[in-house]
Amino acid sequence: MEAKAIARHVRVTPRKARRMVDLIRGKKATEAVTILKFAPQAAALPVRKTLESAIANARVKADKAGEPFRENDLYIKETYVDEGVTLKRFRARAQGRAARINKRTSHITVVVANKEGAR
């Protein structure tokens, strides 16, 4: 069984979020939460919250199906970061000019699944 969580329009650049996602890809879900909890990067928080949401979704899915739920059997099957909308802002510069500032957003997707053979 697999469960999915998507966080959309997260105010962190996709490049920085991808660094965090690459750290946890393929790992056990509980191990990945611990890694993200102690990562100093600001992008670790939204990735961790999305992962915890995917774990909670797996718990709900297992309860609905009447299956036993073991968090230790979950691993990160798939995780990726897509680019969201870019907020464009302008900063005043010298001599009446303006410089554009791009505030990028991300869509973070995490899919967790049971290990093959685990029941």
Curated annotation (Swiss-Prot):
Q: Which keywords label this protein?
A: Ribonucleoprotein, Ribosomal protein, RNA-binding, rRNA-binding
Signal peptide span per the entry?
A: none
- Top-level division of the source organism's lineage: Bacteria
Q: Which Gene3D superfamilies match?
A: Ribosomal protein L22/L17
Its Gene Ontology cellular component terms are: cytosolic large ribosomal subunit
GO biological process assignments = translation
Transmembrane portions of the chain? none
* InterPro entries listed in its UniProt record: Ribosomal_uL22 (IPR001063), Ribosomal_uL22_bac/chlpt-type (IPR005727), Ribosomal_uL22_bac/org-type (IPR047867), Ribosomal_uL22_CS (IPR018260), Ribosomal_uL22_sf (IPR036394)
What GO molecular function terms would the record report? rRNA binding; structural constituent of ribosome
Transmembrane as a keyword?
A: no
Q: Name one Pfam family in it.
A: Ribosomal_L22
Q: Which family does it belong to?
A: Belongs to the universal ribosomal protein uL22 family.
On subunit structure and binding partners, the annotation says: Part of the 50S ribosomal subunit.
Specify the protein name: Large ribosomal subunit protein uL22
This chain's source organism reads: Bifidobacterium longum (strain NCC 2705)
Q: Which gene encodes it?
A: rplV
